């Protein structure tokens, strides 16, 4: 099973299907800025926003990290996990230069299974192997309460929809 999104108006295929509201999030282990392994279970009891994107070195991806850094201050008991294939060094450099301290950057460096399991792996086109742009919101028990696979990778996600779910 696959989905189609667009990159600069050209269709690209995304493997599998993004988790839908009501489903249980799959466990994952990703790489933190200090190169340690971080698992979903480390955020047990907190709501999670998974801001997933191709690379922090693009304008739209960087804008999403900045916006979620701001929104993270508006909701309680919530962590924002910004997930990309970027090396942890690049993620850390970006957040340091931008003064962003309300989000946690995580890399798929040692776990490409995350992309497959979360239905965001681009399998053709110029961004093959990277993540499609998506936002997945989990409750305290890792149940999906919101998900959006952005149809055009060069567009920002629906921040208000994600925030409204957290404020409901």
UniProtKB/Swiss-Prot annotation:
PROSITE patterns tied to this protein: THIOREDOXIN_2, TPX
Alphabetical UniProt keywords: Antioxidant, Disulfide bond, Oxidoreductase, Peroxidase, Redox-active center
GO molecular function: thioredoxin peroxidase activity
Catalytic activity: a hydroperoxide + [thioredoxin]-dithiol = an alcohol + [thioredoxin]-disulfide + H2O
Active site (catalytic residues): 61 (cysteine sulfenic acid (-soh) intermediate)
UniProt enzyme class: oxidoreductase
Top-level taxon in the UniProt lineage: Bacteria
Disulfide bridge map: 61-95
InterPro entries referenced in this protein's UniProt entry, alphabetically: Redoxin (IPR013740), Thioredoxin-like_sf (IPR036249), Thioredoxin_domain (IPR013766), TPX (IPR002065), Tpx_CS (IPR018219), Tpx_Peroxidase_subfamily (IPR050455)
Disulfide bond as UniProt keyword: yes
EC number: 1.11.1.24
Residue intervals of the Thioredoxin domain: 19-168
Note: The active site is a conserved redox-active cysteine residue, the peroxidatic cysteine (C(P)), which makes the nucleophilic attack on the peroxide substrate. The peroxide oxidizes the C(P)-SH to cysteine sulfenic acid (C(P)-SOH), which then reacts with another cysteine residue, the resolving cysteine (C(R)), to form a disulfide bridge. The disulfide is subsequently reduced by an appropriate electron donor to complete the catalytic cycle. In this atypical 2-Cys peroxiredoxin, C(R) is present in the same subunit to form an intramolecular disulfide.
Subunit record text: Homodimer.
NCBIfam families per record: PRK00522.1 (NF001808)
Similarity comment: family membership: Belongs to the peroxiredoxin family. Tpx subfamily.
Function: Thiol-specific peroxidase that catalyzes the reduction of hydrogen peroxide and organic hydroperoxides to water and alcohols, respectively. Plays a role in cell protection against oxidative stress by detoxifying peroxides.
Name of this chain's protein: Thiol peroxidase
Record organism: Salmonella typhi
